[in-house]
C-alpha cells in the first residue's frame, strides 16, 4: 500500500499498519547440528553459531534446542519497531557510524551525516548538506543543498502534533549548534542562525538571526561569509 508521506496523518497510518518487529542476534555455544529453522538465519559450525530472527521465533528455537545449548547471549536494539532503518548501500553520501536514519528518507549526493545524527521519516536532505553530530531532523524536514545543520540542532518534526507545513531550510543556510527551528518554520537561502537560537517564525534569505526567540540582527556580509564558509572538501 502506498502512503502520502507529505501528510502527517498518512505517516501515522503507515506506522500503525506496519508490521512491528523485534529482531534479535544471538550467539550460541552448543551443538545445533545443521541448525535449520523456519524464519531464522543461522551461521556457524561445530559448537558456535550466530542466529538472526524475530524474538518469538528465536525464543521458540532456543527452547526447543535447550538440551543442545551450553550457553547463549542475546543482542537486542529495538522492541516492536514500526519503521526500519534506511538501506544505505545505494546512497551516494558520507554517513558516519552511529547515525540513525529511518526508512523513507531522501538523501542527496555528497551529503554528510555525522555521528549521532537522527533523521526521521519523510525527511529530505539536499545535495551536499551536512547534518552534524547529534543534530535531529524531525519528520518531513526539508534541508536544502549545502546547508549545514550544526551539532545538537533540532529541526522540529511535524508528525506529533500533526502539521501540514514541514520545516524548510534553504540552500546554503547555516544553522548554529544547539539551535531549535520550530514546526513549520522556513529559513531562506544563505541565511545564518546563530548558535543556541530558537526560531519561531520564518526567516528571509540572506540575514543573520540570533536569540530566543530569534530576531534578525543584520544582513549576511563578507565578514559573516568568512566565518560561516561551507567547505566543499568535507563533501568529497
Curated annotation (Swiss-Prot):
A biological process (GO) annotation for this entry? diaminopimelate biosynthetic process
Family annotation (InterPro entries)? DapH, DapH_N, Hexapep, Hexapep_transf_CS, Trans_hexapeptide_repeat, Trimer_LpxA-like_sf
Reaction equations catalysed:
(S)-2,3,4,5-tetrahydrodipicolinate + acetyl-CoA + H2O = L-2-acetamido-6-oxoheptanedioate + CoA
Which pathway is this protein engaged in?
Amino-acid biosynthesis; L-lysine biosynthesis via DAP pathway; LL-2,6-diaminopimelate from (S)-tetrahydrodipicolinate (acetylase route): step 1/3
- Pfam families per the record? DapH_N, Hexapep
SUPFAM superfamilies per UniProt: Trimeric LpxA-like enzymes
Domain of life of the organism encoding this protein: Bacteria
On whether Nucleotide-binding is a keyword of this UniProt record, the answer is no
TM region(s), chain numbering: none
Q: What is its EC number?
A: 2.3.1.89
The terms under GO molecular function for this entry are: tetrahydrodipicolinate N-acetyltransferase activity
Q: Does the keyword Zinc apply?
A: no
Q: Which cysteines are joined by disulfide bonds?
A: none
Supply the alphabetized keyword list. Acyltransferase, Amino-acid biosynthesis, Diaminopimelate biosynthesis, Lysine biosynthesis, Repeat, Transferase
Q: What does this protein do?
A: Catalyzes the transfer of an acetyl group from acetyl-CoA to tetrahydrodipicolinate.
Family, according to the entry, reads as follows: Belongs to the transferase hexapeptide repeat family. DapH subfamily.
Q: Which PANTHER family match?
A: 2,3,4,5-TETRAHYDROPYRIDINE-2,6-DICARBOXYLATE N-ACETYLTRANSFERASE (PTHR43300:SF10), ACETYLTRANSFERASE (PTHR43300)
* Database matches in HAMAP family: DapH (MF_01691)
Protein name in UniProt: 2,3,4,5-tetrahydropyridine-2,6-dicarboxylate N-acetyltransferase
Amino acid at each position: 500500500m502506498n502512503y502520502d508521506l507529505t501528510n502527517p496523518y498518512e505517516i501515522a497510518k503507515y506506522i500503525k499498519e506496519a508490521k512491528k518487529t523485534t529482531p534479535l542476534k544471538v550467539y550460541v555455544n552448543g551443538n545445533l547440528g545443521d541448525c535449520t529453522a523456519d524464519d531464522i538465519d543461522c551461521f556457524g559450525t561445530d559448537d558456535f553459531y550466530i542466529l538472526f530472527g524475530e524474538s518469538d521465533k528465536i525464543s521458540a528455537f532456543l527452547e526447543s534446542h535447550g538440551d543442545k545449548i551450553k550457553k547463549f547471549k542475546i543482542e537486542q536494539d529495538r522492541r516492536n519497531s514500526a519503521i526500519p532503518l534506511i538501506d544505505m548501500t545505494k546512497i551516494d553520501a558520507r554517513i558516519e557510524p552511529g547515525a540513525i536514519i529511518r526508512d523513507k528518507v531522501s538523501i542527496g549526493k555528497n551529503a554528510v551525516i555525522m555521528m549521532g545524527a537522527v533523521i526521521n521519516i519523510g525527511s529530505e536532505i539536499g545535495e551536499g548538506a551536512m547534518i552534524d553530530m547529534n543534530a535531529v531532523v524531525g519528520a518531513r524536514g526539508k534541508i536544502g543543498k549545502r546547508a549545514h545543520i550544526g551539532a545538537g540542532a533540532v529541526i522540529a518534526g511535524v508528525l506529533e502534533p500533526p502539521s501540514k507545513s514541514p520545516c524548510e531550510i534553504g540552500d546554503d543556510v547555516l544553522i548554529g549548534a544547539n539551535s531549535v527551528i520550530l514546526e513549520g518554520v522556513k529559513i531562506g537561502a544563505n541565511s545564518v542562525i546563530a548558535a543556541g537560537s530558537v526560531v519561531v517564525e520564518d526567516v528571509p534569505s540572506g540575514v543573520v538571526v540570533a536569540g530566543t526567540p530569534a530576531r534578525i540582527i543584520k544582513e549576511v556580509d563578507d565578514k559573516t561569509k568568512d566565518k560561516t564558509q561551507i567547505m566543499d572538501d568535507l563533501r568529497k
